[in-house]
Amino acid sequence: MNKVLKLEGVSKSIKGKVLVDQISFEVYEGEVFGFLGPNGAGKTTTIRMLVGLIAPSKGTIEIAGFPVNTHFKEAMKQIGCIVENPELYGYLTGWENLNQFARMLGIKDDKKIIEVVNLVKLSERIHEKVKTYSLGMKQRLGIAQALLGRPKLLILDEPTNGLDPAGIRELREFIHLLVKEQNISVFISSHLLSEIEMICDRVGIINKGKMVRVSTVKDLVKEAAERVEWRVSPTQKAIDLLKKDSTIQDINVKDDLILCRMSPLKINEIIQCFVTEDIQVNGVKTMSDTLEDLFMEMTGGEVRG
């Protein structure tokens, strides 16, 4: 698969404070990549580096094969970006907004505007003033604006902010359609983890400036679903026994409970081992966690943002 975005050992320090610390990840052609992290984790700083607003202190960023530090203009041409709510002129029509932006890009052919309008399904309302649009329609117009330059990578920062459930679903379906029909890669920064779970193919989790995980959403959800909670006595003896099984991972104690990751199919086998070793089993249950639960665990339960 072709790499549309590649970060390698990227760091950013301002006035001696490290905001982003040696992060590396890739985004491939035709995929939706979610970027998650709590407040102050380094998400905004990373996005500012991706779109060329600030330069990395260390490391390299490549966009569609163009190194940002040596081929800045070529790299930036490959990106379309919306940071939260798109910047639009409410007193102009949707068409006039797109036409103004097209002029800035040197686009003189109305066919390109018509193409993106049809793509975001705004043809019936494109000649109405933007101030009459719903927030969801404004998001779609903003995406149309970002697509005018035919980018290979679309960066959306908190795209669902302010949208009602219907608007969120509409945006999610549109992103999937966009990727399928145009083979565009989409990079989404968001704090709505349930949405990331439904929209994205892969996810990168950043905390305190460091990447703590890059994985497929499918694998993360599977991992979360394999958590098992044990209530046993004596606790330490049970922990020692669990540690002898290499297939049982991430063994932790919380409020006299033992939490671990293991196949639910092994529960009966472990119960038999506990009984044989005179360990009293008071309770056991599988944890049907969500991606959000796993995220909170990875980031120390910090507030999302």
Segments predicted by a language model, with ranges:
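ABC transporter nucleotide-binding domains
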Residues: 2-5, 12-188, 193-207, 211-213
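Non-catalytic alpha-helical coupling and interface elements of nucleotide-dependent molecular machines
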Residues: 103-106, 300-304
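Short coil/loop linkers at secondary-structure junctions
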Residues: 67, 108, 123, 248-249, ...
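Solvent-exposed alpha-helical segments within well-ordered globular domains of core cellular machineries
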Residues: 77, 169, 173, 194, ...
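Hydrophobic alpha-helical segments typical of transmembrane helices
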Residues: 78, 97, 112, 174, ...
